[in-house]
Amino acid sequence: MAVCIAVIAKENYPLYIRSVPTENELKFHYTVHTSLDVVDEKISAMGKALVDQRELYLGLLYPTEDYKVYGYVTNSKVKFVMVVDSSNTALRDNEIRSMFRKLHNSYTDIMCNPFYNPGDRIHSRAFDTMVNSMMMQVC
Amino acid sequence: MADEALFLLLHSEMVAGLYRAAEQGEGENGRCTTKLESMGFRVGQGLIERFTKDTARFKDELDIMKFICKDFWTTVFKKQIDNLRTNHQGIYVLQDNKFRLLTQMSAGKQYLEHAPKYLAFTCGLIRGGLSNLGIKSIVTAEVSSMPACKFQVMIQKI
């Protein structure tokens, strides 16, 4: 269950950011912003073989004391960043991968929507529903 | 199968419809080609997103061009590009000896002057696909003898 999910365009501006405890929203925006540097580092690590160059999933970007940040880059250089609560240790790598897959599928559907102009903020309700299903339920 | 014919027929009707509308209105003929190209651009962006969903990350520009020639062309036109040439300085020439959108028209020089109209959409398709993958380019097409045609891609280095 994620705490914050962000979709970032290839020019590095956000297309969609949603976080669950809405009072600390700015902190999550900042976390996502700083994680972009780590994403760029991982993508450009050519020849260092730290990350499998052929894979889209980047894995754990960096852990803080409360949260872990995961990244995924598509072939069209759109980045998905997910912030997950550290206390939730039941989340395995496979689950994170499948969450990113679902995000990528929904993003592809949005791209094919004729009413969506690439580069605009994402307002799709279907996307919102899918993201809601992945976020933590806070009562 | 019938689904191949579907896109061909829709495309011919699109071109014909646009030119008919231009004749009735006041617009110059040059705008039709631009409209077709921009239609192809948007379609190319969406298509590329769908096709590259499951492929691995591309290593470099040549890799991307090869993907366009093989997988992309196969999915859209059910065949691969016959010849890819490059000068390794940003110019690529894609040659298709039997372009599906032109095979129904003629097998030689007949209707040659109408061919560019039918290539505009595909030029936009290539340009849209490349732009979504991070490459700015200019795509032009030329036909010397139907149904073979060449698409020239010029990569813009910013």
UniProtKB/Swiss-Prot annotation, chain A:
Gene3D superfamilies with a match to the protein in the record: 3.30.450.70
Q: Where in the cell is it found?
A: Cytoplasm, Perinuclear region; Endoplasmic reticulum; Golgi apparatus
Where is it mostly found? cytoplasm
Q: Which GO terms describe its cellular component?
A: endoplasmic reticulum; Golgi apparatus; perinuclear region of cytoplasm
- Write down the superkingdom of origin: Eukaryota
Instruction: Tell me the Gene Ontology biological-process terms attached to this UniProt entry.
Output: endoplasmic reticulum to Golgi vesicle-mediated transport
Q: Which InterPro entries has this protein been placed in?
A: Longin-like_dom_sf, Sedlin, TRAPPC2L
Sorted keywords for this record are: Cytoplasm, Endoplasmic reticulum, ER-Golgi transport, Golgi apparatus, Transport
Which is a Pfam family this sequence falls into?
Answer: Sedlin_N
Question: Which family is it part of?
Answer: Belongs to the TRAPP small subunits family. Sedlin subfamily.
The record's function comment reads:
May play a role in vesicular transport from endoplasmic reticulum to Golgi.
The name on file for this protein is: Trafficking protein particle complex subunit 2-like protein
What broad taxonomic lineage does this protein's source fall under? Eukaryota, Metazoa, Chordata, Craniata, Vertebrata
